[in-house]
Amino acid sequence: MIRPDLNERILSLRKLRLAQCRTRTRRTIERRNGVRLEINGSWLVEFCSNDYLGLAQHFEIIAALQDAAARDGIGATASHLICGHHAIHKALEYELAEWLGYPRALLFGNGFTANLAVQQALLTKENDICVQDRLNHASLIDATRLAGCRLRRYPHLDVDGAAHQLKNAPEGAAMLATDGIFSMDGDIAPLRALSLVARTQQALMYVDDAHGIGVTGPQGSGCVAAAWLSVEEVPLQLVTLSKALGGYGAALLGSATLIQHLAETARPYIYTTALPPAQAAAALTAIRIARRDEWRRQRLQELVERFRENSRRHGLEIMDSETPIQPLQCGDETTTMAMSAALEREGFLVNAIRPPTVPEGKSRLRVTLSALHTTEQIDTLVQALARSRDALATEAAPVQV
C-alpha cells in the first residue's frame, strides 16, 4: 500500500476550496479607533467585532494592563501549577466567582482550550455521552470528539430532542452542553427547560456563555443569571474575557469540587502557560466597569432595537435575534460575498459567513453591534444593506425583450 502524500492532499483540498470560492483571507488592521478600522489606508466602520460594550480600548483597562506589565512582566512564565499563578490571577478568579454566583473559577487562555479541558477531564469513558445543540460552537463539538466519548446532537433549540438523545443513552456519565447565545444566529438557548431535562436525566448541564457574559443578566452576569438558574441547576459554565470584556482569556465557573478536579486532571490546563498577568489585570478592571456601567447595556439594546426596526422597514431578511449578533440571511455564497464587498465600498466592514461555518444555503452577513456605534452609523448601514440588496436583485433580473 502506498502511503498518502500530505502535500498532495493539501494541494488537492486547496484546489477544491478555490473551485468552491471558499478560501479565507486575513485582513490586516493598521489602526483602530473604537468601531473604526484602517485597512489598506482606508477607514471603515466595522460591524463584525465582538467588542459589544466598547471596552477594548477603554483608558482604565489600558492603564491596568500597563501597570501590571510594569510590575509582573509580559508573561506568566509557567503554568498555573508550577509558578505561573500570580496574585492578580487569584483576584480575577475571585471576582468572577463573586460576580456570577459560583463557588470557584478557573482561568484559561481562551474558550476553545477551556472547552477541551472540560470534556477531556470529565467524560473519560468511551460509553460516556455529550448531548449538544446542533449549532454549538466548534470547540464544544471538537472537545467531545477529542475526549473519545459519544457525541449526540439535537436540532437547534429543541428541548424534546435533547431529552430524547439522553433517554436513548442511559449508560455512562452524561453531559448536556449548549451555547448561551449562539454565535452565528444570535438567538438564546432555552436554558431553564434544558436544565430541567439535564436534572431529570442525571446529566451535568454545561453552558458556554462566551457571547452572553457582559451583555445580558443582572450587572451583565450572563445568560445563566438572566434565566435565574442556580449553581445546582447549571453546575458548570464557561465565560470568555475576549468579547464584551474586550480582552483575552476565559474562565470556567463551578463548585469547589468540580473546579479542583479540573485543575488537577485537565491536560489543557496543566500543560499550558498561564494567562499573562497583565491580561488578567485588564480583565479584572473590565469586569468592574462592565458591572458598573449599566448604561452600556442599555445603549447596546437601544441600538439592537433600532437596527431591527430599520431593517424591517427596509424589508431586510434579518434572523430572529434580540442580541448584538444580528445575522442577515442571504442564502447563496455569491450573493453574500457580493453584498459584503458592496458594503466595504460604502465604508462598512461586515463579514460574509459561509459554509462550513454555517450550513449549505444559509450564508449570511453577520452584523454585530457595539455600544460605541452611533445611531447615524446604524441608520447608514441599514440603508447601505438595502441598496446592495436591491442592486444585486436588479443585476439578477431577466432582461425584458
UniProtKB/Swiss-Prot annotation:
Its EC number is 2.3.1.47. Pyridoxal 5'-phosphate binds at residues 111-112, 183, 211, 240. Its cofactor is pyridoxal 5'-phosphate. Substrate binds at residues 24, 137, 357. Keywords: Biotin biosynthesis, Pyridoxal phosphate, Transferase. The modification N6-(pyridoxal phosphate)lysine is found at residue 243. GO terms for biological process: biotin biosynthetic process. It catalyses: 6-carboxyhexanoyl-[ACP] + L-alanine + H(+) = (8S)-8-amino-7-oxononanoate + holo-[ACP] + CO2. The keyword Phosphoprotein does not apply. Catalyzes the decarboxylative condensation of pimeloyl-[acyl-carrier protein] and L-alanine to produce 8-amino-7-oxononanoate (AON), [acyl-carrier protein], and carbon dioxide. This is 8-amino-7-oxononanoate synthase. It comes from Xylella fastidiosa (strain 9a5c). The gene is bioF.
